[in-house]
Amino acid sequence: IKYISSYGEFKIGLLPMVYNTLKSWGVEDIKITDKRIIPNIEPIIPTQLGANYNPIKLYPRQIQAIKTLLNNKVGDTPFLICAGDYSVGFGKTLLFCALYKAYQGNLPTILLLNDSDLFNQFKREIPELLPNEDIAFIQGSKCNRWGKFNVAMVQSISKNIRQYQQNLLDIRMVLIDEADIIDNKTYQTVISYLYNSFIRIGLSGTIYMNERKNG
């Protein structure tokens, strides 16, 4: 499989692998230059979500998970294209909402799902976790509006990519459920239109399980 083109280009998600490979070859002077225009917003990790009269507090392990994701680096360079592997019951819904809230709701965000049952579950849960936020749910080809926090079925976006491509250009943070299947064609189609995003974080409970299975 050819990961690097004849021009020396590779997909940005492969940067950690390329960096580690160069290090294993004994290359020491590796310089990473990020020329993307990134808003100067310092993340503040919330300790609770929901309404003030009925707050839902994050557990210390959830707060630590968010810190780990938001402090991800390649070498000494911040690199917020990463994935976290968390067991079932860890609270992925809370993590997704907390990641959005960490940037004070200032980053247009899309949460990509591939399961309709989970979509309906999030449709019930997320508004309670993010009251007063501009939330939109996108399924099928009929979508009248996008919000600041968009929960979308990846199949719907992929099938209607021309209809939604302008909306995707506005997205700055991409959150992905079941990150272990991100390399399938449907996800890749959508992600190829999300090139203005500088944060891409996936969560899964099976990443390393699949690696062990394939090993």
Regions found by a protein language model. Name each.
Residues 173, 178-215:
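Post-DEXD/H (motif II) to motif III coupling segment of the RecA-like Helicase ATP-binding lobe
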